[in-house]
Structure formats: C-alpha cells, structure tokens
Amino acid sequence: MDKLKILVVDDEARMRKLVKDFLVKKNFDVLEAGDGEEAVDIFYENKNIALIILDVMMPKMDGWEVCREIRKNSKVPIIMLTAKSDEKDELLGFDLGIDEYITKPFSPKILVARVEAILRRSN
C-alpha cells in the first residue's frame, strides 16, 4: 500500500523537521512548505495529499489564507498547529473548515495520534 502523504506547513524549519520525524516513524510520506504560497502550490501539484498540518503565522500567505484557498476546492483534513491560543483564533479556524486546532507547545505523540484518528475517519 502507498504511504499516505501529509503536507507540513510552517515557516520554522526546525518545527517542520520535528513534525516530519514523528510522522515518518509512523510510515507517512511528508511534504514540506516554508510559507503559505509554497503550501498552496505543493497542494495543487500533488492531488493525493491526505492531510495538511498548517501553521497560522507565516510570510507571504498566512494559514488562514491557505485554508480559505484550499477549501474552495477540497475537503482535505486540515490540522492547525499554531502558537495562537486565543479562543477567537480557534473559532475562526473551525469557521474556515479546519478539522483540529492544536496550540504550541504541543506533544508530537498526541499530534500523530490526532492525525491517525482523522485519517481513520476520512479514508
């Protein structure tokens, strides 16, 4: 069986690597984007992305804009992974169609468990 592809979007390379390392251990194929514009490009170039893990605060295009753009054409599961912990930000995420909202700092093991739970329901 082919590995499921996950797109990890964060402007911090260290954060992308941390998340990627935990996902790769669970046999996921991970694509990375360092900003919102790159994320949208990668998403439309790779139609078989199973899930997106998305930061909010990034250069060029923030996570909210990425979510709006992707939701125009896709119901791919999206997990927001962000330092923005205000209730209004979390509610905005759900209004835009995200599936899960996780604030930093976070447990990578819990993140992976949530990824697996969402993918079990969506596939």
Regions of interest found by a model, annotated:
Residues 10, 55, 82:
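Active-site residues of response regulator receiver
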Residues 17-25:
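Charged docking surfaces used in two-component/phosphorelay signaling
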Residues 32-51:
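Acidic, metal-coordinating helix/loop segments flanking the phosphotransfer/catalytic sites
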Residues 35-38, 62-65, 89:
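Acidic catalytic/metal-coordinating carboxylates
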Residues 41, 64-75:
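Short amphipathic alpha-helix used as the core "switch/output" element in two-component signaling
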Residues 58:
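Receiver (REC) domain active-site loop signature in two-component systems and cognate sites
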Residues 105-119:
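C-terminal output helix
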